[in-house]
Amino acid sequence: MKLIDSYAVLEKIRDLIYSLLEARDRAMENGLEVIPVRTATPLVRYGFISMLKGGVVMDVTNEQQAEIAEDAGAVGVMVLDKLPYDVRKAGGVARTADLNVIRAVMETITIPVSAKCRIGHYWEAKLLEEIGVDLIDESEVLTPTDEKAHIWKWEFRVPFVNGARSLPEALRRIWEGASMIRTKGEAGTGNVAEAVRHMKAVNRDIAVLRGYYKAGDIEAIRLYAKSNNVPFELALLTARLGRLPVVNFAAGGIATPADAALMMWLGADGVFVGSGIFKSRDPEQRAQAIVLATTYWDDPETVAEAQSMVSERNAMPGIDITRLKPEELLQIRGE
C-alpha cells in the first residue's frame, strides 16, 4: 500500500469520528444524558485501551510536538517534562510533567493524552486523574518513589499502563490493576534490542503456559504461578488465551520504522515511541513513517516505503546499552 492510500484510509476514519461526534451533539440537544469518562468502569477502561491497538503513542513535551504527532496519525501522546534521552542525560530526580503543560496539550489536540507518574507515587497519579488525562503510565523512566510497591490501580477511574520485562512482572502489574502492559526496553537509548528481549521473554513464557494448558497440566500452571509470585487465576487465564489478558505495546528504544515493524512482527499490539521522533532531526517525516510502518507492518513494500521516508543521518543519537553501568539502567526499576 502506498503512502497516499494510507492517508485516504486515515481521512475516512477521521470523517467517521466527526460524524459520530455530530451524532452525539444532536443526541445531547435532544436531552440525552452523557455519562462522563471519569465514571468509567473497568470494562470501559479496557475497551478504551483496545481502541489504541495497531497504533503509535508518541512522547511529547509541548503543544507543538503534540500537533506533529496528531498530524502524523498517532493514536495518542504521552506528555513528559523531558524526553527519556534528556532524562538520562540530565540525571537528578525526574518527576511528572507540569500540569499546565498537560492541560495545554489537552486543549490543543483531539487524540488521547497520557502522562507519566513516578512508580509508587499515588498523588502524582491522583492529580493526573483529576485534570482528566486519558491514560497514566506508572513509569520507570521517572525516578521511583517506592522501590518496593507500585500503585494499587483499582482505586482509580483512569486506566494505567505499566512496563514489564517478563511475564511474571506483567501479570503482577495486571493484578495491581494495570489495563495495559508495555515492554520496558531501555528508554532513551535509541536501541531496540532490550525491547526485543523483553517481548521474546514474555512470549516464551506464554508459550510454556499454553503448552501446559493444552496438555491439561493445571498443576504445572499452579506451580509456575507460585514460583513466580503471581496469582494462579491470572496465569491460568493467560494460558487459556495464549496471550496477555490485556493489550501489550512495545516500548523502549524504538527509533525507526523498521524498529516499529519488528516489534509488531514479534506480537506487539502497538508501539510507544519516546525519544526516537523528537530527538531526531526529521521529526515530522519520522513520525509519519513510524505510523505507516506500524499500521502496515506485515507488508514489506509499505515498510520499505516508510523506511525510505527517513535518513539514518537524521536519527537520534544512539547509546550502546552494553556500556551502561547497572545503576544507569532504567528497566530494573520497579520489578
Swiss-Prot record:
Does this entry carry the keyword Lyase?
A: yes
Question: EC number(s) of the enzyme?
Answer: 4.3.3.6
* Annotated metabolic or biological route of this protein: Cofactor biosynthesis; pyridoxal 5'-phosphate biosynthesis
**What's the catalysed reaction?**
aldehydo-D-ribose 5-phosphate + D-glyceraldehyde 3-phosphate + L-glutamine = pyridoxal 5'-phosphate + L-glutamate + phosphate + 3 H2O + H(+)
Q: Which residues, by range, are in coiled-coil regions?
A: none
Superkingdom in the source lineage: Archaea
Report the sequence similarity comment from the record.
Belongs to the PdxS/SNZ family.
- Subunit record text: In the presence of PdxT, forms a dodecamer of heterodimers.
* Annotated function: Catalyzes the formation of pyridoxal 5'-phosphate from ribose 5-phosphate (RBP), glyceraldehyde 3-phosphate (G3P) and ammonia. The ammonia is provided by the PdxT subunit. Can also use ribulose 5-phosphate and dihydroxyacetone phosphate as substrates, resulting from enzyme-catalyzed isomerization of RBP and G3P, respectively.
HAMAP family in UniProt: PdxS
Q: Mind telling me what this protein is named?
A: Pyridoxal 5'-phosphate synthase subunit PdxS
